[in-house]
Amino acid sequence: MAHKKAGGSSRNGRDSDGRRLGVKKFGGQAVVSGNIIVRQRGTKWHPGTNVGMGKDHTLFALVEGRVEFRTKANDRTYVSVVPALEAAE
């Protein structure tokens, strides 16, 4: 009777799926209130004007307008939303 001994079993072969983090709305893009701008772990980007931060550090728009990224003197990058009224002027 033909027979093949059982091969060893590998302990590798697992990997978790990516978490889909990163910038979702880029500088100059239009957003409405509640739109997610950045998903992140920790504060790589900080909330600026008209931007809120969720408990998982997600940044989201508080008003309708355009997204703006700005680096300040303390080397922190802030994400702001310039309201649609100001952007039109």
Swiss-Prot record:
UniProt keyword list: Ribonucleoprotein, Ribosomal protein
Residue segments, region Disordered: 1-24
Entry's Gene Ontology BP terms: translation
SUPFAM superfamilies with a match to the protein in the record: Ribosomal L27 protein-like (SSF110324)
Superkingdom, taxonomy of origin: Bacteria
A GO cellular component annotation in the UniProt record: cytosolic large ribosomal subunit
Keyword Ribosomal protein assigned: yes
GO molecular function: structural constituent of ribosome
Residues spanning the membrane: none
Family, as annotated: Belongs to the bacterial ribosomal protein bL27 family.
PANTHER family reported in the protein's UniProt record: LARGE RIBOSOMAL SUBUNIT PROTEIN BL27M, RIBOSOMAL PROTEIN L27
Name recorded for this polypeptide: Large ribosomal subunit protein bL27
Organism encoding this protein: Azorhizobium caulinodans (strain ATCC 43989 / DSM 5975 / JCM 20966 / LMG 6465 / NBRC 14845 / NCIMB 13405 / ORS 571)
